Structures are given as structure tokens and as C-alpha cells.
Swiss-Prot record:
Localization (cell): Nucleus
GO biological process: co-transcriptional mRNA 3'-end processing, cleavage and polyadenylation pathway
Subunit structure: Interacts with res2.
Protein known as: Cleavage and termination factor 1
A Pfam cross-reference name: CSTF2_hinge
Molecular function terms, GO-annotated: mRNA binding
Function of the protein: Component of the cleavage factor I (CF I) involved in pre-mRNA 3'-end processing.
Domain of life from the UniProt record: Eukaryota
Keywords, comma-separated and alphabetical: mRNA processing, Nucleus, RNA-binding
Record-linked InterPro entries: CSTF2_hinge, CSTF_C, CSTF_C_sf, Nucleotide-bd_a/b_plait_sf, RBD_domain_sf, RRM_dom
């Protein structure tokens, strides 16, 4: 019996005395089950201890993996995973392998921030209908609320530096977020005259994302996040892209802070190879040097290096600031490229840029 790819989960470590009907009842707690198939031994006719459960949609499939994996069934804990032909399986394993070391280094930091900064949308159980058993909100609900909050922040004339974080935690009680005065003290101004360079609320293309200095505020916000919080944010955004790609595209275009923050989070989690990023930016810079200057746009400039001092402490600070400035310049150059600039590049370089931009959002 064939099953629909993307709607199937692998279930392992099943007790041998459990029937398909019992397993169906268990998985019905997550959502309607289309079919459950135990793999049987052809000689004995008994179960081999694993099987496959098919749902009616991929969203319920992902929810089953999150909610039922390692749940107890008799004396055992069942394994609920994406099958080997589902790209989400490899993505999930890649996150685990690449973040273990980072998370170990952030344990002390995480203990002090988890209670304050985890967005309630990550663990809300009231966003889904009762028939689906609650759990993680659907991508449509998550993306719509995020877009609404981000649009409110971008439309204001003076936007707090922590707008991106505040937009994801708008339902928090302000009393649960100490020290917010220090955060809100750093602000950046949104110049309404820059609207002729791109509409930040209507969903049209952004011709000059760097017209608003998002970099400092986004970097400051993400520096307060633990590894688990960064991973949750990226996983949520990936779910939106996987389930509702068109809605995700409109969300990212309408809110330039969101893709920038996601890309910066990928850098912090070491999900982007710095050497590849450097090669792409250098190639783009060399390509732009051989093209006539455009009347409507110009390639972003690289910040000048901070002059060195005779004092060792000043030299150390200058080196750190210089490295941070270089990294921010690389990110800004990559994100500021217009579709025309990307299409003008040779195919190899163009594919490399698009691959870096989409390597997390596209499977």
C-alpha cells in the first residue's frame, strides 16, 4: 500500500504485542490518521517492532514527531521520526549535530535568559483547534501574527532597537522582562523619505534593505539568545516556508528585519561557511567593479578599518571591532544585492549566492 511522501512518520521500538488499531488510537491524539501499517515478519506473522503512520497533511506529521517521539508505550519509549526519504529528517539531524557544542558553551547563559526571552508562541497550546489537540501553532497563524507585529514596529517613526525580539514576544507581560529600559534606550530612526526606495509594508520588493540600520539592533538582540532559542526561531521559520512557501515569501519581503535576523542567526549557529561567504562577496565585488555605475543604485560600501593604536588594549579592541565590521559588511553586501545584480553574475556565482540565501529555508 503506497503512502503519500511528506505525510508519513517512521515509528520504531514498538512492543510486539501492540496492534495497528492501538497505534492508530495513540497517533489520533495528534491528528486524524489516514492509515497505520505495522511491518510484519513474513515467516512468523508477528510484528518486527516498527511501522509507518500516514496522516492527511505534512503539518500534522511534523507535530507527531515533536509530540510523540520518546513517549512511553508500555515498557518502551517509541521512536517517532521522519522517514529516510523525507528531507526534514536530514535537516533535523544536521541541527542536532551542529549545535551540540554551541549549546554546551551557552548553558550558563541559557539558564538566565530562558525564562525571559522564549516567545510564548513557541509553546502555546491554544492556537490550534481542539480537534487537533493543541500544540504548536500552525504556520499561517505564526506568520500572520509575526508580520502584523513587525509591520507595526516598522511603521513607527522611532523604532526600539529590539523591535524584532519585541515583535515575537508582544504577548509577554512586561513584568516578566526585566532590564528592558536598557534595551529600549538604544533606538534607530526610520526616515519616511526612504519609502521611495521600497515599501516596507505592502509586500513589494525591497530595493535597498540597508536604508534602515537594522544590523546593530538585530545583532544585539540575537546576542542575548541562547542556542536553543536561535534553533527554535529558525525551525519555526523553516516550518512556515515548508508548509506555506508563498505566505512565507510575502512575510520575508514585507519585513526586511526578519530575513536579516534569520541569516545572522545562521551565522551564530555556524550554519553558513564563512569561507564560502567570503568568496561570494569578493566575486560580487569584482564583478561590480567592471560594470558601469547604475543611476538608481550603487553597491554597498565596506566600512573602513579602525586605525590601530600604540596601546595593546586599544589594539585588541580595534581588532575585535574590525573583525565585527568586516563580518557585518559581508552580510550587508550579500543581503543588499538586487535581483538585477544577482542575475548579471555568472551562473556559478549566482547559484552560490542563491544557495547561501536559501540553504536554510529551502530543503
Amino acid at each position: 500500500m503506497s503512502m503519500t511522501a511528506g505525510n508519513v512518520v517512521f515509528v520504531g521500538n514498538i512492543p510486539y504485542d501492540v496492534s495497528e488499531q492501538q497505534m492508530t488510537e495513540i497517533f489520533n491524539q495528534v491528528g486524524p490518521v489516514k492509515t497505520f501499517k505495522l511491518v510484519l515478519d513474513p515467516e512468523t506473522g508477528s510484528g518486527k517492532g516498527y511501522g509507518f503512520c500516514e496522516f492527511f497533511d505534512s503539518e500534522t506529521t511534523a507535530m507527531a514527531v515533536r509530540k510523540l517521539n520518546n513517549s512511553e508505550l508500555g515498557p518502551r519509549k517509541i521512536r517517532v521520526e521522519f522517514p529516510s526519504n523525507d528531507p526534514r529528517r536530514n535537516q533535523s539531524y544536521e541541527y542536532t549535530e551542529r549545535t551540540d557544542r554551541y549549546m554546551e558553551q551557552q548553558n550558563a547563559h541559557e539558564s538566565s535568559y530562558n525564562s525571559r526571552f522564549i516567545p510564548p508562541v513557541l509553546h502555546s497550546t491554544s492556537s490550534l483547534p481542539a480537534s487537533q489537540g493543541g500544540g504548536m501553532p500552525s504556520p499561517a497563524i505564526y506568520s500572520s501574527s509575526m508580520a502584523t507585529n513587525l509591520n507595526k514596529n516598522i511603521n513607527s517613526t522611532s523604532v526600539p532597537a529590539y523591535n524584532f525580539h519585541n515583535s515575537m514576544t508582544s504577548d509577554f507581560d512586561s513584568a516578566s522582562q526585566p532590564h528592558t529600559d536598557a534595551y529600549n534606550a538604544r533606538t534607530f530612526q526610520y526616515n519616511k523619505s526612504s519609502q521611495n526606495k521600497g515599501d516596507y509594508t505592502s509586500g513589494t520588493s525591497i530595493s535597498n534593505p540597508t536604508s534602515i540600520p537594522l544590523a546593530p539592533s538585530v545583532v544585539q538582540v540575537l546576542s542575548t539568545f541562547s542556542a536553543q532559542e536561535l534553533l527554535n526561531m529558525l525551525s519555526k521559520l523553516q516550518t512556515v516556508v515548508h508548509i506555506a512557501p508563498e505566505e512565507a515569501r510575502r512575510l520575508l519581503i514585507a519585513n526586511p528585519a526578519l530575513p536579516y535576523a534569520a541569516f545572522q542567526a545562521m551565522l551564530l549557529m555556524n550554519l553558513v561557511d564563512a569561507n564560502v561567504l567570503q568568496q561570494v562577496v569578493v566575486a560580487v565585488k569584482n564583478k561590480n567593479m567592471h560594470q558601469p555605475a547604475s543611476a538608481t543604485s550603487s553597491p554597498p560600501s565596506v566600512p573602513q578599518k579602525i586605525p590601530s593604536s600604540n596601546h595593546k588594549s586599544q589594539q585588541a579592541n580595534g581588532s575585535d571591532q574590525g573583525n565585527e565590521g568586516k563580518r557585518m559588511a559581508l552580510i550587508q553586501q550579500l543581503l543588499a544585492l538586487t535581483p538585477e545584480q544577482i542575475n548579471a553574475l555568472p551562473p556559478a556565482q549566482r547559484d552560490q549566492i542563491l544557495s547561501i540565501r536559501r540553504q536554510h529555508f529551502r530543503q
